[in-house]
């Protein structure tokens, strides 16, 4: 017969046919939801934040994407160089 299972077990009795209960549909759905949440969390964690960039050359200091440029300038020993300018490129 097509669609029946007559697989003998260790006791010699055949296995009953699989039931079409609601749990057969709920379990894969729950697994799919858990997988989707895990994927979204993994994508969110691996998204990099913009870097705080400080570029110092002989003519200027450029600070980009830093939340508190004044604190950075206090920690950097800046001498009174001739022609030095400061640029804050916050985005």
UniProtKB/Swiss-Prot annotation:
Q: State whether keyword Lyase applies.
A: no
Query: Which parts pass through the membrane?
Result: 24-46
Any one GO BP annotation for this protein: transport of virus in host, cell to cell
- State a single Pfam family of this protein: TGBp3
Which loops or segments lie on the Lumenal side of the membrane, by the record?
A: 1-23
Name the protein family.
Belongs to the Tymovirales TGBp3 protein family.
Task: Relay the record's extra comment.
Answer: TGBp1, TGBp2 and TGBp3 seem to act together for cell-to-cell propagation. TGBp1 is the main movement protein that physically cross the plasmodesma with the viral genome. TGBp2 and TGBp3 would facilitate TGBp1 function.
Protein name (record): Movement protein TGBp3
């Amino acid at each position: 017969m097509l669609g029946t299972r007559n697989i003998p077990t260790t006791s010699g009795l055949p296995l009953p046919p699989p039931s079409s209960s609601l749990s057969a549909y709920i379990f894969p759905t729950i697994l799919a939801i858990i997988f989707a949440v895990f994927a979204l969390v993994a994508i969110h964690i691996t998204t990099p934040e913009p870097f705080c960039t400080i570029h110092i050359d002989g003519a200027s200091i450029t600070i980009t994407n830093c939340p508190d440029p004044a604190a950075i300038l206090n920690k950097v020993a800046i001498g009174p160089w001739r022609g030095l300018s400061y640029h804050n490129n916050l985005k």
